[in-house]
Amino acid sequence: TYADRNTEIWEALANSILAVDENHIMTFHPFGRTSSATHLNNKEWMDMNMFQSGHRRYGQKKGDGDTSVTGLEEDNWRYVEEALSMTPLKPVLDAEPSYEGIPQGLHDPAQPRWRDCDVRRYGYWSVFAGSCGHTYGHNNIMQFLKPGTPGGYGADGIEKPWYKAMQDPGFNQMKYLKNLMLTFPYFERVPDQSVIAGTNGNRYD
């Protein structure tokens, strides 16, 4: 969903929810390679920001031929930096990075699949940049795939079922990132990219 389109609808939805429930965190899940912070950070109903670094690799275009709207591509730490530079300051989370086992680009089963090393990279990139947490996803778990049942996003009915995908390495390695985050008090963690020695690498470097 684009945050800068049909804004009157999002405003009406948010305000209607607030009218009956003021006790839950509210945010906005945006379209791929975009962030709620860009257009909605100043909204009073927006408690925290979300962005979607998405499922495309560097330079990969959407089906309609458009390139990345922001130019940030899959560098999800850049979305974190951008959101944390805004006023008022709000927590930010990558709500949809690349999912383990999903085709790069999302829909073409002939494309390479995102692996455990990729989902780890997104997790540590965003958390070390200052995000309030991280989202993990798996293609087979997301669809609750079961044997013999074709699914979407490259699933052809012969892939492992969702309950076996729960043994995949990326799924099981996310606990290390979680444990690292919980080691330190939440409100004492302060984003500080200046602690990085040397210059930032490029893409996978």
Model regions: which residues?
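Short low-complexity, flexible loop/linker segments enriched in glycine and/or proline
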Residues: 41-44, 108-110, 148-157
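Active-site neighborhood of glycoside hydrolase catalytic domains
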Residues: 1-94
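Aromatic-acidic/polar surface patches that form glycan- and anion
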Residues: 6, 115, 119
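Structural recognition of alpha->loop->beta junctions
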Residues: 41-54, 118, 124-133
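Short, surface-exposed loop/helix-turn segments at secondary-structure junctions
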Residues: 64-68, 106-115
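Short acidic/His/Gly/Ser-rich catalytic and metal-binding motifs that mark active-site loops
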Residues: 58-59, 102-104
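Aromatic- and carboxylate-lined catalytic core of secreted/periplasmic carbohydrate-active enzymes
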Residues: 88-92, 99-103, 119-205
